[in-house]
Amino acid sequence: MDQEVMDFFDFSKEFKREAAPQGYISSDPSIMATETNESKVPKREVIGTDYVPEIVAKEKCLLDRTLRDDCPQSKRNRTLDDLDTDDEGEETEIRRDDEYYKRYRFNLNRDKNLPIYAKREEILAAINAHPVVILKGQTGCGKTTQVPQYILDEGYKSGKYCNIVVTQPRRIAAISIANRVCQEREWQQDTVCSYQVGLHRPTSLEDTRLLYCTTGVLLNNLINKKTLTHYTHIVLDEVHERDQDMDFLLIVVRRLLATNSRHVKIILMSATIDARELADYFTTTNSVPPVITASHGRKHAIEKFYRDQMGSIRWKEEEDDQLVPQINDHGYRAAVKIIMVIDNMEREAAIQSRLSYDEALRYGAVLIFLPGIDEIDTMAENITSMLQSDRNIKVFIVRCFSLMTPENQRDVFHPPPPGFRKIILTTNIAESSITVPDVSYVIDFCLTKVLVTDTATSFSSLRLTWASKANCRQRAGRVGRLRSGRVYRMVNKSFYQREMAEFGIPEMLRMPLQNSVLRAKELEMGSPIEILALALSPPNLSDIQNTILLLKEVGALFLTVDGVYNAMDGDITYWGTIMSRLPLDTRLSRLIILGYVFNLLEEAIIIAAGLSMRGLYVNEGRRTQGADSFWMHYIFADGSGSDLVAIWRVYLTYLNMVEIAHEQESAIRWAKRFHVSLRSLKEMHLLVQELRWRCTNLGLIPFAVNPSQMMGDREKSIILKVIIAGAFYPNYFTRSKESCAEPDRNIYQTISGHDPCRTVYFTNFKPAYMGELYTRRIKELFQEARIPPENIDVTFQQGSQKVFVTFKQDDWLADSSKFVSVSGRVQSEVYKAVRMRLDRIQRPIRIMTQNNFMNYVQQRGIGDVIEGRWIPPTKPLNVELLALPSVFSKTITGLITCIISCGKFFFQPQSFAECIRNMSEIFNAPQQLRNYVINAGAITKGMMVLAKRDSNFQRATVIRPENQSNRQPMFYVRFIDYGDCALLSMQQLRLMPKELIQQYGDLPPRVFECRLAHVQPSSVVSGNNRWPTAANDLLKSVAKCGRIDIEVYSLFNNVAAVLIPMKDGIINDMLVELKLSRRSDEDYMSRKDHDFRLRRQESARYLTLTERQQINEEYLRSCQLPQDLDLPPPPLDKCNTIVMLKGPSSPLECSMQSIIRVGSSKRVNIDNASVNAVLLDADPQDHHDHLIVAHATVESTNGQTLTARGTTLMPNVQGFGALMVMLFCPTMQLKCNNEGTSYVSILAGLGCDPVTGEPYYAEHDVLINLDVNILEDDVVLINQIRYYIDSVFFNFKEEKDPAVSINERVSIYTQLRSLINRLLCKDRSYMQRNMSNSDFEWESNPELPMPNEPFGKRAIFPMHSLTELQEEDMGRLMHLRENCSMLHKWRNFEGTLPHMTCKLCNQLLESVPQLRLHLLTVLHRDREKQIDYCNQ
């Protein structure tokens, strides 16, 4: 790297001092500043549409002036102040096309039976006479296919050139209609008639005269060319849908029609259109668009009934409830009653007429319109439950919604089974997209769900609202196809007529405006406000302003216009240009941009396409999902904790199944097995291809990397998560733990000392129920989660209503959980168990009454009954025989016999060497090895055998047989006295003689399990809490040295946390220095045991040998948890009482909190379909922040709850949240403590007004109170990364495209990889948290040095400045050291501790045990090092 670049990032060099805004961040919910009047987000003023009339009036004058002017002007000005016409490229003479018409066959016979044909001449005359024509024709009248043909036929007759484009709102419609026209006219596809949708486009449009395309395709084409003159006729179909593309297309068409395309004809068509509004929109002084209506006479009558006309239905709601958009229980029951009335009516009609009841059933399907999937499920439950009382009515219920599978979709059209009536429960998808001929009845609740976005917060919410009359009319049109029909509207007629709106709310008034604003910038015909004011329904001025702020936040717009800050506008960046040309949300486009920067473009494209799709998974969006369906998400996520990674892996698997295998049947089987939707994946595949094509056209092309420089899987995973964090900033959340003085102590108290990473619990099981007899029944509850009973231990605590369920931790057990990988220490079974509770909160279990129970256990001799109280049987335990380290032993000498990883290895104390030799001699005596295994059936699970280890036989336990049927039987065994496992054949096993079993069967293992203390695997180097190979190899090299010493830190769950001294230091510390691990806190029980051991070892010299032995036995006995007795339960016919267990629950369950200002006080949920829906503290020993990034955030209707969707759990790296905010925020202030000696928080966002200090975008300001030390060199690294990201796309204003060569990109890519690795691998010391009520205030500091800006005001990521830290005051240092010394003195105090505070860590200490354990935390030990304190 050039020295100039390095000097630029050197903060020791002199800076030019200028006034500059600063920044600050916070990611821990428990320490965020409390919400005060100062920190609350000021309510942004809603500014309406008062700005519109002036701009519209100016536009009207322009239109009138232009249309009056016969002489075209030569220049076109691109502002509203002075717009002229430009007829370059516009034909003033009539263009002939006779040769073209001779090449193709033109059959002029049109279908005269279509209702539109009657209006043919009127339509053509109007088109010839007017620039704009409005055609209103009901669905099925033929307008979409016939009107363009009428125009083309006229061109053929006259020989005039014709080029017609017809827009459709959906791709499938454009394709199918174009194909239908080609078939009707017998034209070859992609000749006279063609279509263009995304990637589906003809290789050449030279011969195309009739083009069907999506609205977006035409819009982008017109924005790029800025003229309509490439077409003679533009037909805008389905104008009533009023999506943003259509509304913006109307703006562009009207503007270009007035400026440079006056001879182009515009035809607007729709079935349900507000013709007057459209006519007014295109009216000028000299021209009023004519409105032509084409009716569609129905063959069968439709009767409409309203709620107040249904006298036989007894409505129970209050009058006021009828005005609220909702469906209550009475509404559901009323719908079922209507179904009953319909059935009775048809039975009576069958008696009086020739139409049989069975025939009426076949054509008498009922279509019920409901607002969402949840309401569909509730309606189905009500129909099923209410009709159980009437066995004469048989119904076949079909659900119909946008995410349904193709199989379910076919059920909608198939006839019901004989004797059944088909009931279709549908959302508004059946309004127009699906037509079912056999529907004779519609029950319409007149409701719909509308997605509304608050532009100030960018939160979206799905709101239940009344449908428009236009919607209801379309719904009513679903009946009367084969016979007369009835429509039942579940509202009063007066309410329908007076209160319900005629049309729905246009997208431009309720959806994000980012793409429209960017298109306005690309159009270059005025500011976004001037352009959007011309919309058919102009948005509020405040919505445009908020959108511009959001676009500045994502890097689409600069803060300034021509170098001057403008709150209502901003120059478009090259990022903004890319975003405007990709058919995606701006944040998904940002994902692709960052993917290009880090050369992970393909991954970014796949994820962006997947996030744009709905329904990749079957049952997505349902209230409950099957266990198998939900856990497929985890399989695809592969321990990443990311819905986005899961999407990427689903797609890659799909490609492998479809493109490589080329077997449709295998793909279908795969989709069913993994509960994914092939239809959605096919649509996603098309979008992926389109995005690749668009990126190539934009110059976004990945480059080949030398194989030696390719990313490894782990590095790729980390970089991908960094990209995700950058793309979706500031949709950041943190996992929040229980807010109490000792949250980790509460975890273990909740589960009575069990391992929280393997244990869940039920409640509501009273001690009187004698739970030990029902352990197998409790294990059976987990069958729905596919957890085998043999992997479960069930225990109880005396006097408690809790049932503890612990999952065995054994990598060798055959279990489907192996396929489910999760990050952190928590076992996947815990996630499965908690998920069970989320689906159903109570679990029934059948038990006996107490009297019957006592008789039962006494008759069978199960345990003892003493004084009317049952004592369960117990397993004998001789703790003095255990090989566990004594409480008085600090250092133990011995051998490491087996290494699975640095987190699990086995140690054999030297004191057992002679015992091991003796046993080996006995086991390998010839007379003991005669019992060969002849029959594989003689080997059973859990059986003790003699197994060959190296050259000798040792005692071993059979784990399980190998699941191989086509070769000789083999068995997995564990060597009891060494800890290792092996797969052995029958020839390598011997049955153990009875005398050996009697002698050694109950002897505990002569090894104990260990793990390295104070360290855990580095998330940057290895994932899923797995230790990297290099770390394990280092430990193995130590083990090969033979006898070593280990230092026992603690003992918990019979696992010793140890330190291993070496010549060059402790191996635990060496792994941290080699960046193979990172420092971590020991969890609560480990620190508690360590404190107990320390105090016992300090008192050992005062105790006799006998006393020490007695204390050690008591200690080891206290370390043993209750054991699962696994007693057979009583027969079910004797269990007449049902107990509802509540759970399972985990003490590690945690919630989330948003770190942006507007969301910090709201409750946060995770989408039920996310892999993070079960959110646990996967590393409970860590007390630093864990960051979660969401693709989108949805707000509840009441505004109190946020739901995070498309979530990704970020790597467990200290300070990761703070680093990502600093890396990807527009600007920030790094705030110091009062003494100015350390950085304590970060405030990030768009910054503030340098004069008033008011934040530009207060709602999205981000605050993180730091829990690790951020130093000056961290900011240097971050500035370098920001510089390199900017350099990829930098261009001067007059330049069209960036001018970065491939070689420069490769160099930037290499530098970015190195810098990211250095940033994330750094071992950062912990620090105490600081809070302030002024955390959200942007501070003004004229003395702050402002770094030179290499890209000036055209930087998307400007350089961060920071305040220089001060040296710690000596007086304060002495004060802190005195406080430390005092705490250590109180450590051995046995009485009641007066409340005191650790001033190093800002921690209140209320008891001596709490003080002792606090002194052992990494935070406190780091702080002691920082002040150079040494405890004497």
Curated annotation (Swiss-Prot):
ATP binds at residues 137-144. Keywords: ATP-binding, Cytoplasm, Developmental protein, Differentiation, Helicase, Hydrolase, Meiosis, Nucleotide-binding, Oogenesis, RNA-mediated gene silencing, Spermatogenesis. A motif (DEAH box) lies at residues 237-240. It is found in: Cytoplasm. SMART domains: DEXDc (SM00487), HA2 (SM00847), HELICc (SM00490), TUDOR (SM00333). Its main location: cytoplasm. Residues 936-999 form the Tudor domain. It catalyses: ATP + H2O = ADP + phosphate + H(+). Pfam families: DEAD (PF00270), Helicase_C (PF00271), TUDOR (PF00567). Residues 124-291 form the Helicase ATP-binding domain. PANTHER family: ATP-DEPENDENT RNA HELICASE, ATP-DEPENDENT RNA HELICASE TDRD9. Belongs to the DEAD box helicase family. DEAH subfamily. This is Probable ATP-dependent RNA helicase spindle-E.
